[in-house]
Amino acid sequence: MNDLLMTENPSRLRVTLPRLAALIVGLALVLFPFGWLGEIWRPFGQIVDDLFSTVWAHAIGHTSLFCLLGLLALAMFPVLRRHPWRYLGLLLLAGIGQEAFQLLYKGRLLLFDDMRDLVTDLFGLLLAFATVWGWGWLWRRDR
């Protein structure tokens, strides 16, 4: 990143910074402890409890959130499409960060549920990658 900031080509920097900002906003939404907010602000907590009342609803929520984050990352940084392991590694760190924040505000140790959440996060990331790959394959085939 430092090399990019020191480059003689400012147009490259103008392209990269908005993309990076979009990804940072996406990461902030993923990392934000909505469960904590639900405890502090009870009307919001009631909505969260209603939306994610079952284990399946919770899993679908995690999968959807990380699928959207993956789609955003792949759209903003297309080079990640050629490096699936980097893509998965970097964005799985967001899942680990999310679980770490949840453990901090809940004040407890790691449980089975937290590992299950990471698996659903990984599934969402893989779904995003497969969607982008499939879309690209269809687009190239039709040309």
Where are these regions (language model features)?
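Bulky hydrophobic segments
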Residues: 2-116, 122-143
